[in-house]
């Protein structure tokens, strides 16, 4: 036979995996002694169904689709069959079932020559009225269906198919006749064949005049692996039963694929046919590339075109013997068209989400997107820490209608971090990088004017998420009075810089030092706050240049409110109210109210809670919730000593770290001192730092400005007690800058040039209202210290 190259479907009979029962396997092609009669078989060919074509109403800047219309058929090329080739029959399997008992009476295999649609075969005689099935172009399957097999089992006959370019394979077909009279001599039989596959054709045209679109990939996604020869599967395939086909990226492509009964949705607008709004297993064409509008910048873009009936927006079924033709004219990157995906996806279609997304400013692509219907990492959230007041199921979705910029830094006071923030109809926030080489921003998804959730964009020329630099940390547990001794852990991978910083390099040059500060976080909150913008010994320091969504400069000590203005409640409802307020107001810095120390609010009349959550006193409801916001917790909430905290931090929806990272546990810095019986020390002999950093300046007004400090902070050995380089080339010297913090009492940025700090995810102990953190000043190193949860400190994330 003539060799034909088929793109998409390749059925190799000898290698197929059939879904047959053990009874079907039987003795194989051994037929009992039955009388047969010659039969003249004539085969007819049922034309492929057309899905119908309707021209869609559309704007000037959208994806132009006419589904099901096949005007101006594309010329034949390698990988596409001609009409004659689609009708070709090379071999047949004939199966005869008795209508009385629906069991197999006889089977036969025959080959046909080119163009032949008739054959002289034999069928069992004396069996009364029978149903005869003809399978074409599937090889010899007679041994797969044993004598006595039921018709119901036969209809389940299926094979696995693979993508690729086959050699000499015709399309599998099936036909039947249910009233063959086996008592008639010299009978004739006519059977109409239908193809057991669907045909998908893509005709892609170029953009508007002046625009440019470069194709990087054309794929057919969610293709069923299993081909049922006889009749359709009863249900849609599972995700494990799906595969994808690729192409050579030419503008005219054809695939032949098994049917996929994906189902229907109640949709009336073609622009609503997008992921999350359609059946999860629906088959679609994915066109990926780079689009450059006239006078604009290049952007990564993808177009998702779901198959189905051409006149029904809600239909997603791919039926056998049906032709699906997609005439796609790429005409822009309209965010109001759900089929259009603009920008490089940072969230892997919603499967790799977090509250922080890292983008590399030196990449050619400046457009990005992430799934904005998922809160943080989408983790299941207990009612105890839920801002909704009820448990949030894993993967629960929000429904934004728009997006906006909350704040951004501007490099040098002018260069913007983000030039554009928008919301796409398909549930993505889309943003474009500005001209800044380094910066931080917060963007929000909203319903109307209400913020539903917000995310931190960390823009840096150093790396993207995949390239984040880490260092190995070993812990150094020891017996210390009043502390629990945890087990030692080694090789913990920790970022080599603060979250949001442009550099982790030790320096004492102002321009370089400020790059190391990163951003500040209040304990348990996901949204960052701008850090100090000076290298000086300063309290009430100026912050880096930062602007809100309206373009107004944000001043230091602004956008702050006392927690007692939200509520003075002490129950779970009060916790919910405060969490909800911070979610809806990511720019608002929450000040503590020390008046919560009184007994009426659960206090002891002496000690405030020092928390941005009102009245979070030890063992009280707000305190128990605060303990778990970042996934840290006490081993025993009633009795735990310092360091008796969970070391396996379970990332929550409030965790501020990028995907693949989480907040550190309390013991992460224990190698920073080497004293035998204490963790915290002001003795330089106990400091596990480079030699040049073994110095104390006890005057807090001088701090690290002292010339004896060669860098603006200290450099610690994360493993061992001497400088070393790991096999991967990373150093064991970690620099922690004197970046200061933002005070939870008045919102001022203090201790710049004096304090080197970093939050852990852990509460300090069962008796303390504080949380654990690294505390270093110019005259001490305290790796196991505690502080007020209303304060905002830098964060250094740990790799999962």
List each model region and its residues:
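C-terminal, surface-exposed recognition/capping segments
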Residues: 501, 597-800
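Tryptophan-paired
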Residues: 64-147, 201-320
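Short, compositionally biased
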Residues: 290, 333, 338, 345-651, ...
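Bacterial N-terminal signal peptides
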Residues: 8-16
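Ser/Thr/Pro-rich, low-complexity mucin-like regions
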Residues: 195-196, 205-212, 281-311, 326-333, ...
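Extracellular beta-sheet/turn segments enriched in Thr/Pro/Gly and aliphatic residues
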Residues: 42, 152-196, 203-207, 310-347
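Bacterial Sec-dependent N-terminal signal peptides
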Residues: 16-45, 202, 321, 326, ...
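Solvent-exposed N-terminal domain segments of exported/luminal and surface proteins
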Residues: 24-148, 513, 520-585, 590-603
